């Protein structure tokens, strides 16, 4: 008796809620990236831009369902090393959805709190961070009711 192919295919893990970030030193940023950070002049002013890093932090609803803001157990917490100075944290853009909230991230020393927002299936919210110092987060913590902990996209 032969096994049917579908009998040996493992069930795929359902995609969930995830994040990813990309850090680019200002000195290496191309015009199209700089254009996505109109707040750069306000955040830095006449100060030197040496050592500044632009971070695009994306939240992804990879499920086939709407995730409501009430499903967030708490705001997404992005913790940077203590010596990292967070000069700005702002909403950047929404993909595959219309953003209904005007809430902005909150900065508390080396911590950025991303506010809970409803997200459409397969949608993305991108936040712009301007940092001086180490741009690699120590941790990213978040949990969505019914979806579990937020994971980094690999």
Language model: regions and residue ranges:
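Proline/serine/threonine-rich low-complexity linkers at boundaries of modular beta-sandwich domains
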Residues: 12, 23-33
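Short, well-ordered beta-strand segments enriched in hydrophobic/aromatic residues
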Residues: 53-61, 122
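Solvent-exposed beta-hairpin/edge-strand motifs
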Residues: 72-96
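Extended, hydrophilic extramembrane loops/domains of integral membrane proteins
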Residues: 117-154
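Extracellular adhesion/glycan-binding regions together with long Ser/Thr-
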Residues: 99-123
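Hydrophobic, helix-forming membrane-interacting segments
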Residues: 1-22
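Asparagine-centered strand-capping/turn motif at beta-strand->loop junctions
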Residues: 59-72, 80
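Short, solvent-exposed beta-strand/turn "edge" segments of beta-rich domains on protein surfaces
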Residues: 29-54, 65-70, 118
């Amino acid at each position: 008796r032969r096994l049917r192919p579908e009998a040996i295919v493992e069930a795929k893990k359902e995609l969930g809620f995830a994040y990813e970030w990309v850090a680019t030193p200002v000195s290496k940023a191309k015009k199209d990236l700089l254009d996505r950070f109109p707040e750069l002049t306000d955040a830095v002013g006449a100060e030197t831009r040496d050592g500044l890093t632009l971070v695009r932090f994306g939240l992804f609803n990879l499920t086939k369902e709407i995730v409501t803001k009430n499903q967030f157990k708490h705001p997404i917490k992005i913790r940077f090393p203590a010596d990292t100075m967070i000069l700005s944290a702002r909403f950047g853009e929404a993909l595959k959805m219309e953003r209904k909230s005007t809430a902005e991230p909150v900065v508390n020393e080396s911590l950025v709190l991303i506010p809970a927002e409803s997200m459409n299936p397969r949608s993305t919210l991108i936040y712009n961070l301007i940092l001086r110092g180490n741009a690699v987060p120590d941790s990213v913590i978040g949990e969505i009711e019914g979806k579990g902990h937020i994971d980094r996209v690999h």
